[in-house]
Amino acid sequence: MDKYLNSFVDHLSEWSSRAFRNNSSSANQSASNKELEQVFEQINAIVENHNNKLTTAFDKISYRVAHKITHLVESHSLVFNYATLVLIASALVVIGSFTSISSIPFTALPPTREHSLFDPTDFDVDHDCHVIYRENDEDKKKKKKSKRFFDMMDEKHAIILPLTSGCTLLALYFVIKKLHLNWLKYVVKILNFNITLLNIPAGTFVYSYFLNSLFRNLSHLASWNPLVVLPRYRVTIADDNEDLNKIGGFVTNLNYKDGLTNSVVHKKTLDEIEKDHWMKHFYRRELVEPKDIKSKRQISNMYLNSALIVSFVLSIVSTVYFYLSPNDWLISNAVSMNMAIWSIAQLKLKNLKSGALILIALFFYDICFVFGTDVMVTVATNLDIPVKLSLPVKFNTAQNNFNFSILGLGDIALPGMFIAMCYKYDIWKWHLDHDDTEFHFLNWSYVGKYFITAMVSYVASLVSAMVSLSIFNTAQPALLYIVPSLLISTILVACWNKDFKQFWNFQYDTIEVDKSLKKAIEKKENSITYSTFILSEYYNDADKYALLGDDVNENFDDDEEFVQEEDLSDSSEEELSEEDLLDDESS
């Protein structure tokens, strides 16, 4: 396989070299190209010198930490290094699984303020589940593009994901092997710039989750008011074309008062302003109660809390530092951790069937590019971008730098999305077994057997990969150990508990029903909310338990019978209405 791959890359390099030679055929063009290269080199030298001055202190910290880690590795062999990698990877998967909850399951009730486990962050997830109608083959042919209310990875991604990943790897391999070193630097800078931009939303998401989770649990344990610890804000942009207030000034509204405000302090502040003539003039508009902002005057609203503000600032700081010093292994690891957690939260598997197919496809993809070729090893070791976890092993005195042991983010994010799906099934199953229970983040009963089984299997498979690496002293595809361990253990537990069929086809926040319901309810939309569905006259207790079972279509064996029953009910209603009219006329 290496032979065919190298020949393919050679053909590409010949074609690119011919193109470069044709573009620079004349002597004037070659001279101008050299001048441009010199200008770019001078600019890069100036920027690098400027960055070195700004990041000298941070580089010293990184080097000191790296030297201490290498000292620990030398004194404890590679056990310390491998154990650290396994611990970090496992922690990222656990955190990513917790952050993947963006809605409540349709088996749960929405959270309420009166519950003992309530926290304001319970309202930060979607409460509306969706009821969608199954489409037959004819409908799928008519609708080439169907609107979806959720973005989940299904069976088709088992083909798309390995193909796109393989094309990306081959493109990077071609850049490393055949293009000039300067071109490789530009490619790395472009990739780092893209990751720098992505780190802003990823870092904000991760840091916000940490702060919200920390203060959520502290407020519950210490019986604090969570709205005092993490107050929530609403920033409204509205037009003032109707009231026409005086322009200028940013003054605190003194009439702001709610249950959290100390009334004594509020009254004391107003008395002090009334006594001071200058202060009274300054707050002259704020002493009068401002008019309410009508909804039709509100241009946009932004909802946030103090944790989100702090997280955004931390994300900006880490992004700027990574931009100034992209080669620092500490900040590179921090950015990689943000990307890993964010990826697990965004990659949502539909059910066990889609997760198993995608992992099996990636299993063969990983083996092909690690054992069959040197593509993955070459790209991972030559591109210094934050798509891997790296820990220093020893200091190379000849090259005056550190040698690192690495673990790709794909070995964290891809199994992580499967483990997150197991965690969602535990939540879904817990509410199914406990009727009429509300969803709350503080409910630690959500950590169930499938999530624990998947995590134990993941840790065991990572340890097996590390042991094989130390024995054979060659790069090991971690998915070779992770995929069989995850699938076999999860499926065995599901079969043992007789949940396999349910787990194989379940959907966390979406209910699929037969299309006959669409005719009965007479809705033109492709989906309705769960709350609307349960309030409809076609939903009774028998239908409720059928929806939670294996197949909804069992209650709708024959569409004609269902329509006939509907017609009979309509006719009976008509007869009743005629009798009522006759009674009214006689009276």
UniProtKB/Swiss-Prot annotation:
Region Disordered, residue ranges: 561-587
Pfam entry (one): Peptidase_A22B
Subcellular location: Membrane; Endoplasmic reticulum membrane
EC numbers: 3.4.23.-
PAL (motif): residue ranges: 477-479
UniProt entry keywords in alphabetical sequence: Endoplasmic reticulum, Hydrolase, Membrane, Protease, Transmembrane, Transmembrane helix
Residue stretches spanning the membrane: 86-106, 157-177, 193-213, 304-324, 329-349, 352-372, 402-422, 451-471, 476-496
GO molecular function (one): aspartic endopeptidase activity, intramembrane cleaving
Keyword Nucleotide-binding (UniProt): no
InterPro entries per UniProt: Peptidase_A22B_SPP, Preselin/SPP
Active site: 366, 411
Major enzyme class: hydrolase
GO BP term, example: proteolysis involved in protein catabolic process
Lumenal compartment spans: 1-85, 178-192, 325-328, 373-401, 472-475
UniProt GO cellular component terms: cytoplasmic side of endoplasmic reticulum membrane; lumenal side of endoplasmic reticulum membrane; perinuclear endoplasmic reticulum membrane
Membrane association type: Multi-pass membrane protein
Cytoplasmic side: 107-156, 214-303, 350-351, 423-450, 497-587
Record note on domains: The PAL motif is required for normal active site conformation.
Similarity field: Belongs to the peptidase A22B family.
Function: May act as intramembrane protease.
Record protein name field: Probable intramembrane protease YKL100C
Organism whose genome encodes this protein: Saccharomyces cerevisiae (strain ATCC 204508 / S288c)
Lineage, uppermost ranks: Eukaryota, Fungi, Dikarya, Ascomycota, Saccharomycotina
